[in-house]
Amino acid sequence: MSNMEKHLFNLKFAAKELGRSAKKCDKEEKAEKAKIKKAIQKGNMEVARIHAENAIRQKNQAVNFLRMSARVDAVAARVQTAVTMGKVTKSMAGVVKSMDATLKTMNLEKISALMDKFEHQFETLDVQTQQMEDTMSSTTTLTTPQGQVDMLLQEMADEAGLDLNMELPQGQTGSVGTSVASAEQDELSQRLARLRDQV
């Protein structure tokens, strides 16, 4: 295993650790919410307010950990691409090396600053790999197409039998062409919409 591969492993591990921290904060938030209910039932609004503040703090912390986990994971994917293409520059390797120590601290501010530095290193690589990314599906970009996110949210809501009350663009398909599966999905969506209108 090369040094770069070790750093890549550490990046992926850190992303998982950040994800675990987010889940821990979620649990803490739920525990605080339970304490809020108990305090309200006892008529102790002062204590309820403290638990409410704690719950909100834990929720925000969970979101921060989750966001950073996704960001580190995206950078790991880009390192993987660079390693695969043999495009790892000396400056990029230096930044990746300094990541190991920073990621162990789990300090979100330091990790964020390092991610900024790393993403800057990739701007040059992005220019070099643009042609390659045009021919393959881009799995290394740090942003996710909003349309895909909206469609997934709607799909999950439909499975759960919920209504998101969102206006989603209809008929969004890839530039390669419409597959049979997506055509069937569109037809199902239209039938589902008609059924909802009848209810």
Swiss-Prot record:
Q: What is this protein called?
A: Charged multivesicular body protein 1b
| Transmembrane residue ranges | none
Task: Identify the InterPro entries for this entry.
Answer: Snf7_fam (IPR005024)
One MF term in the entry's GO annotations: identical protein binding
Q: What is its main location?
A: cytoplasm
Q: How does it sit in the membrane?
A: Peripheral membrane protein
Region of interest (Disordered), residue spans? 167-199
One GO biological process this protein is involved in is: viral budding from plasma membrane
- Keywords assigned: Cell cycle, Cell division, Coiled coil, Cytoplasm, Endosome, Membrane, Protein transport, Transport
- List where the motif MIT-interacting motif lies: 186-196
Region listing for Interaction with VPS4B, in residue ranges:
183-199
Q: How does it assemble?
A: Probable peripherally associated component of the endosomal sorting required for transport complex III (ESCRT-III). ESCRT-III components are thought to multimerize to form a flat lattice on the perimeter membrane of the endosome. Several assembly forms of ESCRT-III may exist that interact and act sequentially. Interacts with CHMP1A. Interacts with VTA1; the interaction probably involves the open conformation of CHMP1B. Interacts with CHMP2A. Interacts with VPS4A; the interaction is direct. Interacts with VPS4B; the interaction is direct.
- From the record, what ranges are coiled-coil? 26-48, 178-199
What domain of life does the native source organism fall in? Eukaryota
* Biased composition regions of type Polar residues, renumbered to the chain: 170-182
Q: Which family does it belong to?
A: Belongs to the SNF7 family.
The segments labelled Interaction with SPAST in the record are: 174-199
Q: Which organism is it from?
A: Bos taurus (Bovine)
Q: Interaction with IST1: where is this region?
A: 132-156
The protein's role, per its UniProt record = Probable peripherally associated component of the endosomal sorting required for transport complex III (ESCRT-III) which is involved in multivesicular bodies (MVBs) formation and sorting of endosomal cargo proteins into MVBs. MVBs contain intraluminal vesicles (ILVs) that are generated by invagination and scission from the limiting membrane of the endosome and mostly are delivered to lysosomes enabling degradation of membrane proteins, such as stimulated growth factor receptors, lysosomal enzymes and lipids.
Subcellular location per the Swiss-Prot or TrEMBL entry: Cytoplasm, Cytosol; Endosome; Late endosome membrane
